[in-house]
């Protein structure tokens, strides 16, 4: 019988204060069956992104937090608690490093070897940093991306447009909801029937289809009628996409959210059933990887052909282009990345994914904070539309949570307002405030967030390290540095931060420092690279940059 983990609710503490209770509840929330993709194996999302290295390490993390003093800091090395040291009350209670490798050895083969020896763990982005909130965590970012695409190409709406993608895991599961929120009709291909069923249960997906003809019939009818509809098709994109090309059916928009970043534990080869693929993964991993990469090449070739025939095609940051390129698809990078196409201008303004979680477990706490963010920022139309749609259509997974994109100044203002609500007793318990690592100044990822930087600094990884150091110095509740999230081992370095709004005056200082410096560094990073929007923002906001002219 598999173990079931669920975060405590209510106001009873299991640790010495809320600054320690917060990571205690959030690591458990990451493994809640409502939240995690494969909780029995400690896998939260993203192929093999884990919350802890093994169950023994998980239990020791909880035990360490239960006994942690208010002026101590727990160190976690790739999902394993390795030390507790006396620091001070304003220091982080937990510091995490996941999957870090010396650059010469930063590749999947070395990582898998070390993982098999029990020495490391893949933390993805928010899996190993204990701030994953289910598919909602990416829905809003996906909504922002498709909204920017719709604004650029289709007068702000996806109405009457056919969007094709694949992957309905923890990340990809956000796609159908985001697309239908913008009135589009979409077909999402997924090999795992259970993942499709899960998205139906959470109301992120409208319909499941077993047959391509059936799926196309529904999607094309919805497109013609200008009706929002999402269809999940049981199938493999490496088979389905080439078949669409053969039939001459070219969608308006094409992207991909399969776990292509991980050719062993993520992407599933075509030409076999899912059960056969899982068996091959265990019996002959080298053959599995070979077949997976071949399938990715076929997948990308079909996307390129659709692009040539007029589809708007973009890469959604899963490194599928690189995998295909390595298999001989030399024009794979003709497909542009979503960040320079649709998101970078937002990063230049210090905007990014801001999330908060009700430690009480009471949805009313989130609804009250929804109202507060609308009161604070009434002139932001995308934010207001998102909050309204999220309240109507996003089902909570695990502890109730919300996400929205906020910029420099907005984050600190809202964070302080939340802390004031806790202090006044308007909320039943403290609120955890965090973000995805996919943010303005916290990641170096040349095939995703930092692709095609203006000054050529795509691979410069000082920025996420500076981000983690700054957030530690600013007094965050916990800080993490990870390797390989989103695009796989060897391709990214990134940092996460969480602060617990416990209602105290001391936490006002934490919040103001963390939620100002964190997005502020993103503006600095982009201004340093020569982006005019970031330079203008830095000057307007009074951000000190010694070498800014």
From Swiss-Prot:
Any keyword Lyase?
yes
This protein is called: Urocanate hydratase
> Which organism is the protein's source?
Caldanaerobacter subterraneus subsp. tengcongensis (strain DSM 15242 / JCM 11007 / NBRC 100824 / MB4) (Thermoanaerobacter tengcongensis)
Where found in the cell?
Cytoplasm
Q: What is its main location?
A: cytoplasm
Enzyme Commission number(s): 4.2.1.49
A single BP term in Gene Ontology: L-histidine catabolic process to glutamate and formate
Matching Pfam families: Urocanase, Urocanase_C, Urocanase_N
List the catalytic residues.
404
Q: What class of enzyme is it?
A: lyase
Function per UniProt: Catalyzes the conversion of urocanate to 4-imidazolone-5-propionate.
Its UniProt pathway annotation is:
Amino-acid degradation; L-histidine degradation into L-glutamate; N-formimidoyl-L-glutamate from L-histidine: step 2/3
The family database entries (InterPro entries) matched by this protein are listed as:
Urocanase, Urocanase-like, Urocanase_C, Urocanase_central_sf, Urocanase_CS, Urocanase_N, Urocanase_Rossmann-like, Urocanase_sf
Q: Which cofactor does it need?
A: NAD(+)
Q: Which UniProt keywords apply?
A: Cytoplasm, Histidine metabolism, Lyase, NAD
The UniProt GO MF terms for this protein read: urocanate hydratase activity
Cross-referenced Gene3D superfamilies, in alphabetical order?
Answer: Urocanase like domains, Urocanase superfamily
Q: Name one GO cellular component term.
A: cytoplasm
Q: What is the lineage of its organism?
A: Bacteria, Bacillati, Bacillota, Clostridia, Thermoanaerobacterales
The record's free-text note on cofactor binding? Binds 1 NAD(+) per subunit.
* Entry keyword Transferase: no
Lineage top rank: taxon: Bacteria
Q: Which reaction equation describes what this protein catalyses?
A: 4-imidazolone-5-propanoate = trans-urocanate + H2O
- Binding annotation for NAD(+): 46-47, 124, 170-172, 190, 195, 236-237, 257-261, 267-268, 316, 486
UniProt record similarity statement: Belongs to the urocanase family.
